[in-house]
């Protein structure tokens, strides 16, 4: 009898609490607790806990608004919202990366490459910024550009379009600014290219270091070492800037 009584009490408690009162961690400091949506310890006033979902880094959407880091993004018409990929979304013919509008993006050809990169027929974007819009280099056909498998490595990128293979380096200009420099990899077979690490790539005939052929290398015995350097049967290839290449 006592067991039956305890079960009834437990069921009544659960019925009164309800699922809406159970704390739920959505991620990136967002949570739902007691029918309220929180960012950290702050209540997001007006946010709907029944429809709130995390759609990107610190990016939350419900049936009325989109929030970034706990702040409502202005001028969003939620009925026209479309998620394009993690961190990228569209609203009223405007493309956004997180909370930033991508100026002059081509809506028709826009495509998300991964959570931090996208493209349209004119540009490649990191976040909301075009990486090929300066004199640091150009990608001949952005519309057909794709990253190579394993081609996104920290500040180093490898990709190709229907014409060329590209080595893309993000270089620090000073303590606060960086810029992408884009180099066409010459004489490479774009249909046989393979990324070995952030310094070395290869095709069916040659090994390339930061986008340039390593001359005199023994192709068949070349391998990448655990520390990232390379070696063949004759010597080791230690990473240094291009004007200081050293082999032993």
What are these regions (language model features)?
Residues 1-21:
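Classical Sec-dependent N-terminal signal peptides that target proteins to the secretory pathway
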């Amino acid at each position: 009898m006592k067991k039956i009584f305890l079960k009834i009490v437990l069921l009544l408690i659960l019925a009164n609490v309800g699922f809406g009162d159970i704390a739920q961690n959505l991620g990136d400091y967002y949570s739902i607790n007691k029918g309220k949506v929180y960012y950290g310890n702050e209540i997001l006033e007006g946010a709907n806990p029944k429809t709130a979902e995390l759609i990107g880094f610190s990016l939350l959407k419900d049936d009325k608004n989109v929030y970034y880091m706990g702040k409502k993004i202005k001028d969003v018409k939620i009925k026209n919202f479309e998620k394009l990929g993690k961190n990228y979304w569209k609203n009223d013919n405007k493309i956004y990366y997180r909370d930033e509008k991508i100026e002059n993006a081509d809506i028709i050809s826009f495509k998300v490459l991964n959570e931090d990169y996208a493209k349209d027929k004119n540009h490649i974007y990191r976040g909301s910024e075009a990486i090929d819009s300066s004199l640091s280099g150009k990608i001949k056909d952005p519309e057909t550009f794709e990253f190579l498998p394993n081609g996104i490595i920290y500040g180093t990128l490898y990709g190709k379009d229907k014409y060329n293979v590209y080595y893309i380096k993000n270089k620090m200009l000073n303590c606060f600014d960086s810029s992408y420099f884009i180099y066409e990899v010459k004489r490479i077979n774009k249909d046989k290219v393979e990324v070995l690490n952030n310094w070395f790539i290869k095709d069916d005939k040659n090994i390339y270091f930061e986008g340039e052929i390593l001359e005199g290398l023994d192709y068949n015995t070349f391998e990448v070492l655990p520390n990232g350097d390379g070696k063949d049967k004759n010597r080791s290839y230690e990473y240094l800037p291009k004007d200081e290449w050293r082999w032993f």
